[in-house]
């Protein structure tokens, strides 16, 4: 049985080159700035991502943590939220790819994960 791959939506503050780099590696990744929704509030962003079955990768922990709590309490489904501290582009790419290789869409669904869980062991 094959595992469904994660589809990602990168929030507008994430390095835009990440979408291109991951797409070139065969992953389904889009950047918010390429969707016509730049500047969208967080709730509509999550609604948009959920409707497309896309997990959101964001640096915006301040707004997304309480938003996800509200969605959890309301039993609203989403494809997952990945929170991250700001990282250099190479590190961001490595950790994002490690996440995409490690988890399936089903494992990420309705969860919140830290991208830093997927950093290389030192």
PLM-predicted stretches and their roles:
Residues 1-12, 16, 21-24, 37, ...:
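Acidic, PIN/NYN-like endoribonuclease modules and their adjacent C-terminal/linker elements
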Residues 28-40:
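Conserved BB-loop
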Residues 50, 54-67:
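Acidic, metal-binding active-site segment of PIN/NYN-like and related structure-specific nucleases
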